[in-house]
Amino acid sequence: YSNDEGILSIMYHRFNENKYPSTNIKMEIFREHIDIIRKSNFDFHNPNNFDEQFNKPKQKKEILITIDDAFESFYTEAWPYLKENKIPFILFVSTEPVGKRGYMTWEQIKEVEGNEFANIGHHSHTHEYLIDVSNEEFILDIETANKIFLRELGYIPNLFSYPFGEYSKFMKDYI
């Protein structure tokens, strides 16, 4: 397709949760997004091949689907559709809210993670605005999440999404 080595990425959060319009998408519109992606001849980038394929020239246009925060609405609304269609994605999980009202449980996360087209990513422990915390607080947050990921999944995810998309050089170097 081109010598461009990049991959387009689309991030989603909530599905069919009209109470949160800034982070919500209706499933009807989400399905339309997927249809447009397919009709535009994009391949869905499988996150399981992320490290080995990311910086290589692409034969076709590729797009990466990411889901932030592991809201329960992802599991009840989008997950059945993604699973049925085997659409690759990364689910970025903040460990602190897991199991709380409105969030997925570890059992649900493990179910999702058990599919070859799904990948669990690291999204910190508290989902704080990390740019406002000290380096020590940042390290504690990440290490707390790492321990929980090890306990619950048996590994620490190798893909990281910064909450709110902001970070410092220290944070980037630490991750």
Tell what function each PLM region has:
Residues 78:
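Acidic, polar ligand-binding/catalytic clefts
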